[in-house]
């Protein structure tokens, strides 16, 4: 292997047995059917204008085009919404993934029950194909679609971590980038994928 160049040093997330105190191969993992609770999580937008077109080795084409994207002030008060059945991985979040082939829209809530997680006036960024299902599941009475978002705008965007400032000021103060990934679909969820590189291979690969 060494003579043919197949031996290399790398890194990847691996399964870990708390009981055995050792790493586990994927072939050793058995999954049982389990009904999980799901949560919606809002990532407040921080759309950033990057100065001048720059080419960064290793960056995707969309991220390089992001330097040309204008910023809509309405997006500064919007939130990218993710859907997850593994809320315990949120502290490990370092990015949100989208798919440049999916159509996304900016939706402004116009009516919602008292105490709802989404309040009138809030703006949410979602995949258009899933918007109506999300509205019903989230018990939002009505909203209006304000406009479309381009892949360039999404790639130019960054979000605040949902735990920003918790439990102490300055905690989780880093920005969360939006990354283009083919593994994101509009079959279920919101069209955005919470990305925690320490909790999955897809997450790790796109984040790296």
Kindly give the residue locations of the regions a language model identified.
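NTP-handling and nucleic-acid-processing catalytic cores
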Residues: 1-208
